[in-house]
Amino acid sequence: MPVAEFPGSRNWGYDGVYPFAVEQSYGGVAALHRLVRACHDIGLAVVLDVVYNHLGPEGNYLRDFGPYFTDRYRTPWGDALNFDGPDSDHIRRYFIENALYWIDDCGIDALRLDAVHAIYDKSAYPFLQELADSVHDRAAELGRNVYLIAECDLNDWRVVRSASSGGLGIDAQWSDEFHHCVHSLLTGETSGYYADFGSISQLATAFQEGWVYRGQYSPVRRMRFGNSPDGIQG
């Protein structure tokens, strides 16, 4: 879960407003350092959830200090961050430095990138590709293995393809459709996006292939959805 500072003392962390500040009710950055060291001492890697698609609505003062947000796009949770508009170079660098901060200063081993489908960016050098390049370069400098894991509901193989093969270079991708298959089978729920799932064969496909919808028709979306992940290691 994300640890960025948020209003109050209890929260899932997805409306954090100070990306570099560890939530004080968790013990701040000193407590995070202790947790990471304790995990490493017993051979556990630490994966941190980070949110680079929006900031929370309460206590968010970044807008007062620069063009961090854009009105060209809108996320389900509020204003989108400015990754491809005027003065966006500085905003991109701010969030890349945030990723490097968790890796360098806190010893984090992997970052789970929240809802990258809500990172809107039409630039020729996508922010996510620049982020992946920067993180992998830093990992090489440190002689460490550091991974990026994207949450993405687009079923798009380009997220995890290497940049040399036309992708973004993210190391792995969250498999939401595996979850949806398991949930629908165990609960029988058919509302919302669960209406697209419910069979054992779909669960097998999600497990073996990464996701279910690879270009075929999705009843919920009423369109063909996704592309084939053939050739990508599961």
Model-derived regions: residue spans:
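Substrate-binding/active-site clefts of carbohydrate-active enzymes
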Residues: 1-110, 115-141, 158-159
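Conserved alpha/beta catalytic core and glycan-binding cleft of carbohydrate-active enzymes
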Residues: 128, 132-234
